[in-house]
Structure formats: C-alpha cells, structure tokens
Amino acid sequence: MKESTVKVLDDKDLEFAETLRSLGVQRNVAILITYLANVDEASSRDIEMGSNLRQPEVSIAMRALRDNDWVSEKEVRRGGKGRPMKVYSLLTPIDEIIKHFEEEKQQESAQTMESIQKLKELISG
C-alpha cells in the first residue's frame, strides 16, 4: 500500500475562505481558491481530501475558476490503464483574484449609490 501526504486547510485558511464567502463567493469556490492558493499544484483527489469537498463539488467549483481563467489544468497519465489524473494549479496570483472581488464590490457599491441618488432626485423633483 502506498502512503502519501496531502495538505489540509487549517483555521487561518478556513477564515480566509469564510471571508471570501462574506464577499458573496460560493462556499465550494471559496474553499477551492483557498486550497489552491496554498499548494503549487494538486490532483482532484488531493483537493477532495485536503479541502473536505466531494468530487462533484470540486468539479462544479472548478468550473467557476476555469470560467474566470484562474486555474490551469493538465492531465497526468498514471501507469497502466484508466483515465488520466487531472492536476490543477492557480494560473492567476491570489492577490489578483482578491483584486477582482474588490473591483466587483466597488462597482456594485457605485451602482447602489447611483440608485440612491436617483431616488433622492425623484422624491425632490
């Protein structure tokens, strides 16, 4: 039997993921971003074990990262038959991902303030 070690999320990582969630990021996406920010690369199986997410949750969350071009994906052939293993790594530095959410929230805030200003104008007009 082979033995391997997998990095797991600690309390600080979970706090980071929760902070992402407070910005409106889906739970599994936040956990996936946090996990990948802490490793050079990881297989789907490593991510499942280290983040405590199930395979379908990893796949769905990975789609969101792929849609934003934040993750690279490569297939690694294992010896023998069967499907190749997928290995993922963050393509975009974590500070740029944070900047994306910062800009998104600033834009939302500006739109909200615009609506409030319009309400003020309508009520006084």
What are these regions (language model features)?
Residues 92-125:
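Amphipathic alpha-helical dimerization/coiled-coil segments
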Residues 18-28, 43, 76-98:
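Short, cationic-aromatic polyanion-contact patches
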Residues 1-23, 78-79:
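N-terminal leader segment of winged-helix/HTH proteins
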Residues 62-63:
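Short, hydrophobic-biased segments on the C-terminal half of alpha helices
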Residues 19-53:
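N-terminal helix-turn-helix DNA-binding core of bacterial DNA-binding proteins
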